[in-house]
Amino acid sequence: MLGATSMRVHDVTLTLRPGMPTWPGEDGPRVEPLKRMARGDSSNVSVVTFGDHTGTHVDPPVHFLEGGATIDQLPLEPLVGRCRVLGYGDDDHISGHWLDGAGIGMGTERVLFKTRNSERWRDPRAPFDQEFIALDETAAHWLVRAGVKLVGVDYLSVEPFGSGKLGHPVHVALLRAGVVIVEGLDLHDVAPGDYELFCGPLKIAGGTGSPARVLLRQR
């Protein structure tokens, strides 16, 4: 029997690096030297530049709701606690009908979706894939009705590419209900099941989002 100190911890965070996939129209991260001991400085210091929706990141309400809470105003409770990782093998987007039979138990507050998207993260320089699997609007409303407080997905958006033409209905439905959205998870090495989630976005004043370190501890 595993003791608490020997439980495996999975890091499901994408590594921030130049050249990584980003949302179309958004710049990738840059890491530039500010000080280097090799050139006579007393320490090594870098300047890191990235958008606040780069890599594994958290969407606060203000991302799509004018006047909504910013990243530094998010409640902490949804970011830490028990979560369910659901495996999804279909090629269609995740629907409320599928969730009816997914076995999400009463009281489940955090749900992460592992789809074929996670396999793309094995290649850190794979180009952006517009055909990623996401949630449709019926799934968003299902999760809200079920009382879920945090939803995580394994690509760079919780809703299908091109949904901006429709007003981003999945984001809006979740964020209006106070559901925290975590995007860009790398779940390729994580089996479906129950875990403890630890999600730490940066505390950026007025931030419209933030990269986050996300860990799962095996239960």
Identify the residue ranges that each predicted region occupies:
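Active-/binding-site microenvironments in catalytic and ligand-binding cores
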Residues: 1-219
